[in-house]
Structures are given as structure tokens and as C-alpha cells.
Amino acid sequence: MASADWGYGSENGPDQWSKLYPIANGNNQSPIDIKTSEANHDSSLKPLSISYNPATAKEIVNVGHSFHVIFDDSSNQSVLKGGPLADSYRLTQFHFHWGNSNDHGSEHTVDGTRYSGELHLVHWNSAKYSSASEAISKADGLAILGVLMKVGPANPSLQKVLDALNSVKTKGKRAPFTNFDPSSLLPSSLDYWTYFGSLTHPPLHESVTWVICKDSISLSPEQLAQLRGLLSSAEGEPAVPVLSNHRPPQPLKGRTVRASF
């Protein structure tokens, strides 16, 4: 997929995506606004079971509109199970979304409240599929754990990730990123909301069981500024910082949001 045909500007941003990706107007698009009064507590939802092996952290890559921290997903060493999931899902990468000011940047909102950013830990169904690229378009293919981020005290767990951004400042750069436990980025409570949705950027496949943590994590204004220092331009090109990379909430279209709490 060419990443140049979409972005977050006025010409190629979320409002324009449906021209190239008609599913953008589909019935199961993400993110959404989570209305807490309409989220149904479901006592059949299990607790999340998260088991991440820090040794599976592999590299950090500037993908142009964001950066990905990539994990070795060749075996079930870092997995998400339980919760709403019938199968075991293998961690393949995590990434962040942010905005051009501290009062917005998250993709999901809660009762209309926008957060400063959002962490997405992307997992694929290794019980049914042989790779992330096979699973990405299947209805039960992906599970994404979403964590809302609120501006506040600095987050020491996040700093190792942010410090690595200097080595991948421009689009296409990659660098080793090893021995990192992403569970250090999760809130202490794993109460969650869950619903069926999509990738939040092209190709926008409706293949995601979303699990959104009820509690947010904090990061400082300085840490947010480090995220915005990432460049979407390649080396040697005029510098274009990634100031904003979030899609606004999409219509629920009759879907149910369930709460574990």
C-alpha cells in the first residue's frame, strides 16, 4: 500500500479517505465516541490476560505518518488473550496517535472528551492465521488494545521509546529497539470497553476487536512535543513534522459497546 496517497492534511486527510477507500463510510469504522451511559456491562467478559516478553521487541520504524515499535511475532511469546477474545492474539507492533495541541490527539473519545494522545498495541489472531498480513483483513483477525493518554506528569516508561525517536527522525528510517516490556505502558487497572471496529487509517479494514482501557496513562507536555518532532519527510527533503495523526470518531451505526466493569 502506497502511504503517499493518504495522510492527515486537508487534501489527503480523513475526510478524503473514502475516495480511495470506500470502506471509510462502512458500518464498523473506528474510532468511536464511547458513551459510558450506553455501554452495557457484560458479566460474561473475562479479565484480559496479557503476557509480553521484553525479548520480542525488535526495532523502531518511521512509517511517515507515525512510528511503529515492531515485535518478533514468529511465535506466541507476546500475547493477548481473554477479555472478549475467543483466541490468542500475538503482538506485532505498537504505535501512537497525537494532535497539534495538548487538548486533543486521541482517536477514541469518552463522552465527547478528547485526550492528548492514544497508544495502540496491535495483535493478530495466531490461532487461525499464519501472519499479520493474512489476518489484517479477516473479521476476527486483529485485536487492538487502546490506551488513552492524558497530559500530566512525565511517564518514565515512555521515555525509552521517545529517546529512540532521534534515531528514526525521518521517514523510512529504522533502528534496533530491544528489551522493552510494553506492559509497562498500561494503566494499573485493566477494566475495559470493547466493540467491533476497524483500522483507524487506510486500508481501514473492518477486522478489529477493540479493547479500550477505562483508565488513561499520563505523559508530560515535553513528551508530547517529542512525538510531534517526528518527521513525515525523508532525509534530504524539507522537514515536515508529524503534528497530528488522528482520525475523528466515526458513527456507531447500531454497534454495541460492552464494558467489563
Curated annotation (Swiss-Prot):
Alpha-carbonic anhydrase domain boundaries:
4-261
List the active-site residues: H65
Where found in the cell?
Cytoplasm
Does the record bear Nuclease in its keywords? Answer: no
The positions annotated for binding substrate are T200, H201
What GO molecular-function term can you cite, just one?
carbonate dehydratase activity
**EC number(s) from the headed UniProt entry:** 4.2.1.1, 4.2.1.69
Q: Where is this region: Disordered?
A: 239-261
Q: Which GO terms describe its cellular component?
A: cytoplasm
Q: Which PROSITE patterns match?
A: ALPHA_CA_1, ALPHA_CA_2
Q: Where does Zn(2+) bind?
A: H95, H97, H120
Which sequence positions carry the modification called N-acetylalanine? A2
Q: Which cofactor does it need?
A: Zn(2+)
**Primary residence:** cytoplasm
The answer to whether the entry has keyword Cytoplasm is yes
Stored InterPro entries: CA_dom, CA_dom_sf, Carbonic_anhydrase_a-class, Carbonic_anhydrase_a-class_CS
The UniProt catalytic activity note for this protein reads:
hydrogencarbonate + H(+) = CO2 + H2O; urea = cyanamide + H2O
Keywords (A to Z) from UniProt: Acetylation, Cytoplasm, Lyase, Metal-binding, Zinc
> Would you indicate the residue range of the signal peptide?
none
User: What modulates its activity?
Assistant: Inhibited by acetazolamide.
Function per UniProt: Catalyzes the reversible hydration of carbon dioxide. Can hydrate cyanamide to urea.
Q: Which PANTHER family match?
A: CARBONIC ANHYDRASE, CARBONIC ANHYDRASE 1
Membership in a protein family: Belongs to the alpha-carbonic anhydrase family.
Q: What is this protein called?
A: Carbonic anhydrase 1
List the taxonomic lineage. Answer: Eukaryota, Metazoa, Chordata, Craniata, Vertebrata
